[in-house]
Amino acid sequence: MGRRRGVELYRAPFPLYALRIDPKTGLLIAAGGGGAAKTGIKNGVHFLQLELINGCLSASLLHSHDTETRATMNLALAGDILAAGQDAQCQLLRFQVHQQKGSKAEKSGSKEQGPRQRKGAPPAEKKSGAQVHPEGVELKVKNLEAVQTDFSNEPLQKVVCFNHDNTLLATGGTDGHVRVWKVPSLEKVLEFKAHEGEIGDLTLGPDGKLVTVGWDFKASVWQKDQLVTQLQWQENGPASSNTPYRYQACRFGQVPDQLGGLRLFTVQIPHKRLRQPPPCYLTAWDSSTFLPLRTRSCGHEVISCLSVSDSGTFLGLGTVTGSVAIYIAFSLQRLYYVKEAHGIVVTDVTFLPEKGCGPKLLGPHETALFSVAVDSRCQLHLLPSRRSVPVWLLLLLCVGLIIVTILLLQTAFPGFL
C-alpha cells in the first residue's frame, strides 16, 4: 500500500488559521491573512463550494470577503452566522446563499481531487459585502455587530465558541477572562477571570458547563462564573512528575449510540521543548464526574489543534510540525496519520458534517477531515470505510460451513461420499 498523503483542495493567497463547514450548504469557510503589517499579504474569509465530481471531492472559490487590516485567527459557526476572532475583537458575519433560477451547475470537471477554477471566475478579492455569481449561485456576506473581547497589554482573542442553541457565544483571550455575549446583539451577559495568563481553549457543553484551559497549567470546569472543579490529569497520569505539562485543547463530544451521552476530550503537551521531547497525551473524561476515563500517548510531535466529529466517533489532531491524524474517540487508537502533511504548523482541523450535505459529499468513505495551516493550503484527509468483519474470519466461516454441510450429508445419507 502506498504512503498516505493528504489531498490539496485549495490554496489561499494568505496564511490560513481557521475553517468551518456549513452542513446545510456544503460551504467550506477558510479564514486568515497577513495581519495589519504592510507586507502585501491580504486578510480575508473565503467561502468554498464543496462538490462531489466523478466520485472525487472538489472545492472551488465562491466568494472572498475582505477583512481589511484584520486577520481572522479563529471561527465559530451557528447557522448562517460566523463569529470571527480578529485581533482583540469578535466580528459577527452573516452569509446568505441563493440559487438563481434558470442556471445549471457545471457537471464536468477534473477526475483529480483538488481545487478547480470556475469558468469566468471573479477576481480573488472583493470588497466587503460583494456578491459573486458563478454558475447561478449568489452568495452575500454582511458584517453584523463587533465588540472588543480582550483587554490585555497585547490584546488578542484566542478562541470563540457558541452554546448548544446558538443564543450565546463565549470568548477567551490573552487577558485570561471569559466573556459571554448574546447573539446577535453581542451584549455582554457574563465576565469572569478564568486563568492567570492567556486562555488556550474553551468549550461549552449542552448543560451549560464551560471548560477552559490556560497557560497556567490548569483546566477548569465552570457553571456560569462558579468554579465546579479542576481537571486532575498529571497526578495519576503516565507522565513523569518532573516534566511539566499544560492543557492545549479541549472539546466536548457525543458518545456514539448513547442518547444524551457526553465525553470531554483534552490534549496535554509538554510546557517546554526538550532535546528529547516527551510525548503528548490525549485524554477522555467522564462529563459528569470529570474524572479521566482513558489516556493515550499521541506521539512526540506537539499537538496544535483538536476536533471531534459530530457523532463523537472520531478525533482529529494537527501538530506544530504539520502532521495530521485521526483517532477513534472510544479507544483513542490512531487510525490515520500523515507525517508533515503541511510541513508547518497546522492551525485548525474540522470534520465533514454528518448531517445535511455531509453524507452526500463523503461518498464511500467513513469520515473526512479537513486541515489548514500557515502554508496557505487546505487539505482533505479521507478515512476509507473499515470492514466490519475481517476477511480471514469470513474465509474461516466459509470453510467451516462446507465441512459441517459435508458431515450432515454423510450422516443423513450413509455412503454419500
UniProtKB/Swiss-Prot annotation:
CC annotations in GO: endoplasmic reticulum exit site; endoplasmic reticulum membrane; nucleus
Modification 3'-nitrotyrosine occurs at: Y10
Subunit-level organization: Interacts with SAR1B (GDP-bound form). Interacts with MIA2; recruits PREB to endoplasmic reticulum exit sites. Interacts with CIDEB; facilitating loading of SCAP-SREBP into COPII vesicles.
Name under which the protein is recorded: Guanine nucleotide-exchange factor SEC12
Gene encoding the protein: Preb
Pfam families according to UniProt: WD40
InterPro entries reported for this sequence: Quinoprotein_ADH-like_sf, Sec12-like, WD40/YVTN_repeat-like_dom_sf, WD40_rpt
Region ranges (Disordered): 101-135
Source lineage: Eukaryota, Metazoa, Chordata, Craniata, Vertebrata
UniProt cross-references to PANTHER family, sorted A to Z: PROLACTIN REGULATORY ELEMENT BINDING PROTEIN, PROLACTIN REGULATORY ELEMENT-BINDING PROTEIN
Lumenal topological domain: 410-417
A GO molecular-function descriptor: GTPase binding
Cytoplasmic side: 1-388
GO BP annotations listed: COPII vesicle coating; endoplasmic reticulum to Golgi vesicle-mediated transport; protein transport; regulation of COPII vesicle coating
Subcellular locations according to the entry: Endoplasmic reticulum membrane; Nucleus
Predominant location category: endoplasmic reticulum
Sequence ranges of Basic and acidic residues compositional bias: 103-115
Membrane topology designation: Single-pass membrane protein
Segments traversing the membrane: 389-409
